[in-house]
Amino acid sequence: MPRRTSFGILKAMRLRQRVDYVAVQSDGMKLHGRHVLALARRHPGTGPHGRLGLTVTKKVGNAVVRNRIKRLLREWLRLHGWVPAGWDMVLVAKDSAARQLHPDDFAPDLLRILRQLS
């Protein structure tokens, strides 16, 4: 069984290698939201769940802000539904994400993105 990490997210549920991020970026489709850009790619070998990668660039803010955005996105996905099975998805935070202080501020974007993938 895969080893658990913090927040109850299994390692098998995360994109961890650069080659996975590059594959999603080159072969995937783009779904634009107000505060996040989602890059998604079909990957049937992921098991009973999808895999997620998060990217928050330095133009969004300093390290404290970037880490907070990643925590908020992870928490919202953990509580409201993960990436659908058979998909690899990378969420890229836009500049406007720095002004979002609550996980539910990302809800409209993430709900629409997850609906399109299902």
Protein language model features and the residues they cover:
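Positively charged, solvent-exposed patches that mediate nucleic-acid binding
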Residues: 1-118
